[in-house]
Amino acid sequence: WAHDRFGGYAQSGLLAEITPDKAFQDKLYPFTWDAVRYNGKLIAYPIAVEALSLIYNKDLLPNPPKTWEEIPALDKELKAKGKSALMFNLQEPYFTWPLIAADGGYAFKYENGKYDIKDVGVDNAGAKAGLTFLVDLIKNKHMNADTDYSIAEAAFNKGETAMTINGPWAWSNIDTSKVNYGVTVLPTFKGHPSKPFVGVLSAGINAASPNKELAKEFLENYLLTDEGLEAVNKDKPLGAVALKSYEEELAKD
């Protein structure tokens, strides 16, 4: 599961502490270990890093826009051809958040290595600017306010819209649809990068398991190897992975 679930599991006593040695820890990107640390202890092995990206139809749009501000004009151009520029899930904040956060919006202020839950940045000037831009896209009929995950996914996979915003979990369905697609970073807004939430797909060990050492052996010497992750990735795309050596191979693709 993604790492955001693991704090609750650990709090309930469901996860065993893991103790990989430094040599193994060095094989993975350091920030991924931070995602699976609870009260100073490691509670899972990071597998992959999931985040939203811009997915585009290469046949409809060989060169995707670099900025959100380009999208209205692009949509007008594509509408003249019976297509639309962009459709994505507008029903869940997870998908709209990257735009809201781009110019300075934030959930909780992060300072000195911790979050201040009393400092919420969803109504500051940057958040309002991003949300206003999104509302204007809807008001000007560049997007439909009723668009949800399934509607957006179907439209992209049928070639009806040139772009969508989704994560690596969506790639296998696009592969099945035979759309000629590319994946790139989300557009910038007012010169600032979009800021999606990041999930670290992780594997933990049940605290009640009688086979903790076997589980550790499997995770460290089979799953978290180039060959192990390649086998998983062929079945279900992982996106970016925590293992440095295999991520370097993926980066060549």
Predicted regions and their residues:
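Beta->alpha turn/N-cap motifs
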Residues: 1-5, 149, 165-171, 201
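Short helix-initiation/N-cap motifs at beta->coil->alpha
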Residues: 4, 69-70, 144-158
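Short, solvent-exposed loop/beta-turn-alpha elements that line the ligand-binding surface or hinge
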Residues: 19-28, 63, 106-129, 176, ...
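C-terminal lobe and pocket-closing loops
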Residues: 170-180, 189-253
